[in-house]
Amino acid sequence: MSDSPFFPDHQPIQLPKIKIRRPKVGPGAITIAVLVLLGLFVYAASSFWTEILWFQQMHATRILLTRWGVIAGLAVVGVVLSVAVLRIMIGLAHRHRVSSKRGEAAANLRQYQDAIEPFKKLAFWLVALVLGIPAGLRLAEGWQTVLTWLNATPFGKTDPIFGWDISFFVFTLPFLELVVSFLLHLVFLSLIVSIVASYLYGGLQVVPRPHATAPVRRHLGILAAIASVIIGVQYWIGRYSLLTQSGDNIDGAMYADVNATLPAHSILAAISIAVAALFLVAAFRGTWRLPTIGVVVTVVAALVIGGAYPALIEQFRVRPNARSLNAQYIQHNIDATLEAYGLDDLDYRTYDATTTAQPGQLREDSESTSQIRLLDPQVIRKTVQQLQQSRPYYSFDSGFFVDRYTINGERRDTVISMRELNLAGLSQEQQNWVNRHTVYTHGFGVVAAYGNTITSDGLPAYWEQSIPSKGEIGEYEPRVYFSQSAPDYSIVGGPEGTPNQELDYPDDNAPGGQVSTTFKGNGGPSVGNVWNKLLYSIKFGSTDIFFSSQTNEESQILYDRDPLLRVAKVAPYLTLEQKAYPAVVDTDGDPSTPKRLVWVVDAYTTTDSYPYAQHQSLSSSTVDSRSQSVGQYIQENSINYMRNSVKAIVDAYDGSVRLFQWDEKDPILSTWMKIYPGSVESKQNISADLMGHLRYPEDMFKVQRDLLTSYHVRDASDFYTGGDRWRLAEETSTAATANGVSTATMSSLQQQAVRVQPPYYLTMQMPGQQSAEFSLTSVFVPGGESKREAMAGFLAVDSETGSEAGKVREGYGKLRLIALPSSTTVPGPGQIQNAYDTNQTIASQLNVLNLSDSTVIRGNLLTLPVGGGLLYVQPVYIQGSGGANYPVLRFVLTAFGNRVGFAPTLAESLDQTFGGDSAAKVAGGDQSADKNKGGGDQQNQAESEPSKQLASALQDANQAIQDGQNALKNNDWAAYGESQKRLNDALTKAIDAQKKLDAQSGSGS
């Protein structure tokens, strides 16, 4: 009879006995199984073994094996511990099983027990593995945390609350949180598994009333006590995490955190330990009442002491007195933020700028005015593409960069770019595997132009150009096998004496119209044997690699060719600059060897655990109107500590990577150098030539300038009121539009950032600086909702590293901030742009160009603190209609105070602004350099006449406008009519001249 009151005649369910027959395994099945296993092994090897080959070729095997070894070790520890604990929990539940219970539920459980009994060991291990493996793998995710804790380097600075060294928060605290999180997860999982297993084996009863046998009670009680202890530890270490937490506006522990939340965590930790003791008592004394009360008390205490009490303190104690009560904690935040981001040595001064422009005012600023950069790297890309591309399969996709080179003994600002390979430029007939992966393998050379000089036709004045490369650089290795736009892989190399397969560069005088070459370096793993060819065929999904006759015993496969990716792989702990920039340098200091073409990569060590420092989002701080993408090699998006600790170079020919310790005081880099000894070279190994091309990194500067919109205020009380907040100036140039940038595919963050003016590299002298130096600059305007565009501050950092081997020039990295007094209104970039737009002379002349179907493109608006005030300079480019046309520099806009200038040359424009004679020294007097032809002698000669006609016509139009205005003032209608006739004639001539220039530029490629 059944014990069930509802179904008295119900009989227990009888499970049918199933006889399992073992299938016969024949030789065919064994063969198939072996082949499947072999296939899986080869497929796996195409990933892990090719990765080993890549790191071996890079001489960085230790970096890979250390990472893999630690990950594997932690995974094994985590999985073994998790699986073992869970298996023990299930085994204990089975050992403490009860088989004498009566009733329907007990009968059904016995049937489950009987059914699983023959396979119990397998079932127990299977459950432990299924649940334990994912739990254990969680530990491996913290491999970097474990390594840095084991090799931690002290910061030598302490936090203001506990007095611990900063390294505790950066290295030790994350490790403790990792361990506590893993253990707590494992204990709770063990509790759940133990409860379920004990129920299935009768040791735990749910109905008609909860009941546990003594062994099960001890089992669960001890587990609950362990969980309670771990929770107590979690509360205790949570006290330290308060100092690194993010706040609504200010990060770190404020008054309520220190005086309410922190003590609450201590109390809750003590309560948790007490509850653990109650669980132990219950485990051996048989009553659950006390631990149940303890759990309830813990929950209530967490809600009241940990939640409600701090909230009440914040609402009724702090908010009415926040300025005074939070003052010392805000000061902690200010001090820590300045230290964490390298802003503690900022040179801050008030700049009483004049807005009056007078003749001769720039006489004392010749060092700055002579290096005013007229070439906008963003705008001239299309110009250089048309004139220097040479063939459709070349491009300048990585962009143009501002650098400085010594030419004829003079240090000159330069705009430079690599000529990279672009397979998209091949015709459809050329798009075959042989061409894409064995013939078209590399780009060739660089194009470099003076930053402050143009030809008479508005073209860049090149000092290095053409294929083969010719100019002022001298002998260097020009082949670009490694770049951002390089093919996904190329197969290169061959024995001595075999025919060259790779296209080197086009040459009309060579057989077939091209010169061929063979790669001679050590740039990639070998594919000279069947095994490697098989692995790489699978890796890249191409049978051509395996069957191609183009490969030989000396063949190498080049892949992972993006310079940023190569640095990221050999230094996975670094956050990288969004872009690498090119340089032609003597890397070994030996003048007898050719120079090398390299990519320079700035790299950072970051953390989000610096106590009291303000958190910054890298994805928002580093995006502006000209970098409308977020770097993909960001290790941490939210950070509160940043150092430019490493300078890396990637050889464009063989892809070799060298890392140099740039910041020798950074504890985070020192820690990683202990982990990977020998992977980072000393700064002393930097050659003199390479040192001269390093610079202050742009992304670091962007983060710093973003912080200085608020943290230029050093007093806690003033900081809290926020009355002197700034914001970054908005972009005024039209370069982004000219280069086809569309906001349609941008995120909301990027659409907002598109308005922010980027920082600019230029040579200039700041107030208090001894001489003009290569600098990185940015402009601030007042914050708030008023959207005033007046100038509020100007920031510059000394970016000149010097040219002494192994030694950085004194003064490098010095940040200088000048603040404009509120009593003086100095026009900001937006107001200057408005002055340009509303100036009748400027507007009329630009309208003439628009009438001729040309496009007016305004370049970067540069700001320089010269003449006792602030000078603005903006190049104006004209681009004809049609896809083959390109921008040429036709005019220069200048402004100082309320005076503006607009003329074909910088010198003329400055003279207009400063009453006829600025006394400024500019490049070549009128910034033209016909001896450095921008597009070839014949083109310059052809363009000279229309250029002169356009300039003359615009001058006539300007004069006619002025005469007409004077005639109106004098009510001389006859003179006004005559001036209008002259204006119409001048406009007609200007339009005709511009059309001729457009036609010539359209055929200039």
Predicted feature locations:
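Soluble extracytoplasmic regions of secretory-pathway and membrane proteins
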Residues: D3-R22, T31-N970, A974-S1003
